[in-house]
C-alpha cells in the first residue's frame, strides 16, 4: 500500500493521531521521499523543532521511522537523517488490535467476576469488598451504596471482543 493510500485511510489517520498527537500530526501526515533532517521538516512545516523531534521519536519508537547519524567533520555536530517506514503501519495496527483484544478480555473477566456498588450521588463505583469496608456508605459524600448491574457493559464488551476476534481471525479462547 502506497503512502498516499495509507494516509487517506481514516483508521490510519486516527492511529497516527493517537501516536503523535495534534502537534505531531503534520509531521506524520507529510512523510517526505527519502531522508530528511528534523530541521528541514520543522522549516518546511512551520513547526517548532522540539515538536518535530517529539513526533519523529514517537514514530521511531513505533517502528514507523528510522534514522542514521552523520557527524560533521568540521564542527563535530551530529545530524540525524530520518526516513519514514509507513509500510509497517498495517503490522503495527494488527499488534495494537491484539493488545486491545487482550485488554478487553481481561476487563470483561474483571467485570463479570466482581460485584459492584455505586453511589447515586457522586457516581463513585466500588467492588463488594470496598463497599463492605465502608459499611455500604460512600466515603466521599456519605450517600448509600447501591448494588450495580453491569450486564450491559459486559455485553457491549463481548460484542467488541467478538468483532475484534472476527477481524483478527482469532478463535474464541476456551476457559
Curated annotation (Swiss-Prot):
Residue ranges constituting the HTH TFE/IIEalpha-type domain according to the UniProt record: 8-90
Pfam families: TFIIE_alpha
Transmembrane feature ranges: none
InterPro entries assigned to the protein according to its UniProt record, in alphabetical order: TF_E_archaea (IPR016481), TFE (IPR039997), TFIIE/TFIIEa_HTH (IPR017919), TFIIE_asu (IPR002853), TFIIEa/SarR/Rpc3_HTH_dom (IPR024550), WH-like_DNA-bd_sf (IPR036388), WH_DNA-bd_sf (IPR036390)
Example of a GO biological process term: regulation of DNA-templated transcription
UniProt keywords, alphabetically: DNA-binding, Transcription, Transcription regulation
One Gene Ontology term of the molecular function aspect: DNA binding
Domain observations: The winged helix domain is involved in binding to DNA in the preinitiation complex.
Subunit structure: Monomer. Interaction with RNA polymerase subunits RpoF and RpoE is necessary for Tfe stimulatory transcription activity. Able to interact with Tbp and RNA polymerase in the absence of DNA promoter. Interacts both with the preinitiation and elongation complexes.
Function field: Transcription factor that plays a role in the activation of archaeal genes transcribed by RNA polymerase. Facilitates transcription initiation by enhancing TATA-box recognition by TATA-box-binding protein (Tbp), and transcription factor B (Tfb) and RNA polymerase recruitment. Not absolutely required for transcription in vitro, but particularly important in cases where Tbp or Tfb function is not optimal. It dynamically alters the nucleic acid-binding properties of RNA polymerases by stabilizing the initiation complex and destabilizing elongation complexes.
Family designation: Belongs to the TFE family.
Stated name of the protein: Transcription factor E
Species per Swiss-Prot/TrEMBL record: Natronomonas pharaonis (strain ATCC 35678 / DSM 2160 / CIP 103997 / JCM 8858 / NBRC 14720 / NCIMB 2260 / Gabara) (Halobacterium pharaonis)
Name of the gene: tfe
Amino acid at each position: 500500500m502506497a503512502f498516499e493510500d495509507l494516509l487517506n485511510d481514516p483508521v490510519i489517520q486516527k492511529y497516527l493521531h493517537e501516536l503523535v498527537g495534534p502537534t505531531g500530526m503534520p509531521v506524520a501526515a507529510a512523510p517526505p521521499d527519502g531522508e530528511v533532517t528534523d530541521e528541514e521538516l520543522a522549516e518546511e512545516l512551520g513547526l517548532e523543532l522540539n515538536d518535530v523531534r517529539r513526533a519523529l521519536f514517537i514514530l521511531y519508537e513505533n517502528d514507523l521511522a528510522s534514522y542514521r547519524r552523520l557527524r560533521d567533520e568540521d564542527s563535530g555536530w551530529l545530524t540525524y537523517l530520518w526516513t519514514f517506514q509507513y509500510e509497517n503501519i498495517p503490522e503495527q495496527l494488527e499488534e495494537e488490535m491484539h493488545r486491545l483484544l487482550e485488554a478487553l478480555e481481561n476487563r470483561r473477566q474483571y467485570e463479570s467476576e466482581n460485584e459492584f456498588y455505586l453511589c447515586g450521588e457522586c457516581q463513585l463505583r466500588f467492588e463488594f469488598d470496598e463497599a463492605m469496608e465502608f459499611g455500604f456508605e460512600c466515603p466521599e459524600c456519605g450517600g448509600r451504596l447501591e448494588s450495580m448491574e453491569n450486564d450491559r457493559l459486559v455485553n457491549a464488551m463481548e460484542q467488541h471482543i467478538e468483532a475484534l476476534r472476527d477481524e483478527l481471525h482469532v478463535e474464541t479462547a476456551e476457559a
